[in-house]
Amino acid sequence: MNGRADFREPNAEVPRPIPHIGPDYIPTEEERRVFAECNDESFWFRSVPLAATSMLITQGLISKGILSSHPKYGSIPKLIFACIMGYFAGKLSYVKTCQEKFKKLENSPLGEALRSGQARRSSPPGHYYQKSKYDSNVSGQSSFVTSPAADNIEMLPHYEPIPFSSSMNESAPTGITDHIVQGPDPNLEESPKRKNITYEELRNKNRESYEVSLTQKTDPSVRPMHERVPKKEVKVNKYGDTWDE
């Protein structure tokens, strides 16, 4: 294999180019015959009935007073206008039928142009269908055709992009922080020990200390030694000196 594959289907139809129909186009004999036929049929089968119907409706509206007549010419201007509108409406309504007549002509450039234009307008469904078949053929054939470059690409490791933060440092990833891992806080370890003393224990402790201080005040035997030892009487001379007897 040369690395290239022909994805064109063997039974695929090659679209023919649309013939250019310009102002200098000379119609064929068949096309002239169809033109004359369309002109006659559109006149007798569409224009005349619509023109006559429009004139009758207009005359009826004038006679009922819905439409006013001309003071000098009466209803003639409105009837002529209704006839002209019916004539052109009949011609326009026959255009689609005349196009179908040209499409049925085999060796007609004008008919081929009309058929190609209709195929172009209705091409999206077929276009997507052919495109899906083309994609399936590409995927089916590319599975058998491999190149060294494709093998090297498959052997390369796949890396996932790391998201970067939009903070002060743009080059730092969002998952990385600058803080240092610290050890356990000693205050956190001591806090549970302090919380072991309950309110009841503290209350009992305060009550015991209060009772001890109260007994020391009331019981003379518990008083300190310097309070129980009586003071010695000393004599003082006129100069303020003391002596024992």
Curated annotation (Swiss-Prot):
Extent of Basic and acidic residues compositional bias: 190-210, 224-238
Keyword hit for Phosphoprotein: yes
One matching Pfam family: OCIA
GO cellular component, one term: endosome
Keywords of the record: Endosome, Phosphoprotein
Positions bearing Phosphoserine: 108, 116, 123, 191
Any GO BP annotation: regulation of stem cell differentiation
Role this protein plays: Maintains stem cell potency. Increases STAT3 phosphorylation and controls ERK phosphorylation. May act as a scaffold, increasing STAT3 recruitment onto endosomes.
Domain remarks: The OCIA domain is necessary and sufficient for endosomal localization.
Protein name in UniProt: OCIA domain-containing protein 1
Organism, as annotated: Pongo abelii
Gene name of the record: OCIAD1
